[in-house]
């Protein structure tokens, strides 16, 4: 019996195949597949799912036929299930959103909250009765506070203000120009509006903000602390929807933004100010969470093992 878990995100698609004991037999990576609508979206989605699953099957040495599969997607599952059924040979199928599989990966099948800060951001939780709630995750136009994209957007804003003479001096200005080859912050702002700088490429500049903060730039430090504060706020919002005051709650963090010690420790401090809350890193990745959901679909209470250590 074979089981499939897929994490289809804004940056990459990761597939894991496991046997009935929970042992991971193969993994595969392909391009992003978060949007089906729009020019070429359907074709990219199909290519990403097929590519990641075929790569995982090749590594495992198995045919692509599954007892159960769970796939979680950024951008929601509503327009994707029919396509998945066309692509996969599977008996039992769950198509859900990426926050749901991230939560299962982060805290297992227990109650808790996962707060994700990668290209975008969201907080998502589940109580002991299975009730779920979310906060944030509104996308880059209306939300994604504390995400990598948002941090870079804020960094460009302070760089523009400094350049135009209505903001304080900041090393973020020179950092952004050095990293992108732009001559001015104004030029970079216009480049960010072009197809040369998709959101993922803009978000990829976020670690440079952390490096600038490490060199003592006050505005860079403030941006990171503010981002951590916003992530703590959406976490508190989910807690308030699901848990009573003082009730023990496990909060897990996930995503590249938490690679910053400043963000991570400020977030932990703010979350643990709430009575009963403990914060720490996610136990497993969203792809492992998807695999765990696939096991549950088939009525198996097994834990994944032999999980690849290097996963996007």
What are these regions (language model features)?
Residues 1-62, 105-113, 156-312:
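ATP-binding/phosphotransfer module of carbohydrate and carboxylate kinases, centering on a glycine-rich
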Residues 9-11, 65-67, 117-119:
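Short, basic and Ser/Thr-rich N-terminal targeting/leader segments
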Residues 11, 74-77, 119-122:
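Short glycine-rich anion-binding loops that position phosphate/pyrophosphate groups of nucleotides
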Residues 86-94, 131-139, 269-278:
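Glycine/charged-rich beta-loop-alpha catalytic/anionic-binding loops adjacent to active sites
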Residues 101-103, 122-123, 287:
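Short gly/pro/ser/thr-enriched loop/turn and capping motifs at secondary-structure boundaries
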Residues 110-162, 166:
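Glycine-rich phosphate-binding loop of actin/hexokinase-like ATP-binding domains
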């Amino acid at each position: 019996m074979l089981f499939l878990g897929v994490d289809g995100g804004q940056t990459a698609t990761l597939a894991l195949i496991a046997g009935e004991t929970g042992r991971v037999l193969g993994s595969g990576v392909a391009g992003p597949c978060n949007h089906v609508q729009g020019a070429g979206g359907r074709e990219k989605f199909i290519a990403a799912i097929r590519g990641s699953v075929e790569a995982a099957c090749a590594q495992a040495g198995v045919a692509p036929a599954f007892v159960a599969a769970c796939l979680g997607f950024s951008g929601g599952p509503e327009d994707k299930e029919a396509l998945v059924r066309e692509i996969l040979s599977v008996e039992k199928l769950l198509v859900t959103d990426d926050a749901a599989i991230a939560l299962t990966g982060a805290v297992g099948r227990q109650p808790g909250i996962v707060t994700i800060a990668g290209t975008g951001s969201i907080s998502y939780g589940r109580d002991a009765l299975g009730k779920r709630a979310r906060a944030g995750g509104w996308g880059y136009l209306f939300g994604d506070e504390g995400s990598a994209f948002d941090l870079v957007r804020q960094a460009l804003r302070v760089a523009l203000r400094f350049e135009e003479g209505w903001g304080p001096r900041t090393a973020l200005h020179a950092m952004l120009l050095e990293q992108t080859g732009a001559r001015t912050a104004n030029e970079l702002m216009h480049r960010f509006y072009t197809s040369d700088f998709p959101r993922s490429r803009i978000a990829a500049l976020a670690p440079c903000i952390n490096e600038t903060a490490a060199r003592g730039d006050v505005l860079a430090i403030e941006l990171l602390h503010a981002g951590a504060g916003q992530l703590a706020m959406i976490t508190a919002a989910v807690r308030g929807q699901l848990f009573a005051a003082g009730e023990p709650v496990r909060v897990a963090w996930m995503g590249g933004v938490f690679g910053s010690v400043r963000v991570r420790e400020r977030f932990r401090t703010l979350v643990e100010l709430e009575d009963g809350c403990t914060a720490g890193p996610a136990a497993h990745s969203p792809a492992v969470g998807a695999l765990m959901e696939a096991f549950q679909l088939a009525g198996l209470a097994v834990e994944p093992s032999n999980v690849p250590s290097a996963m996007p």
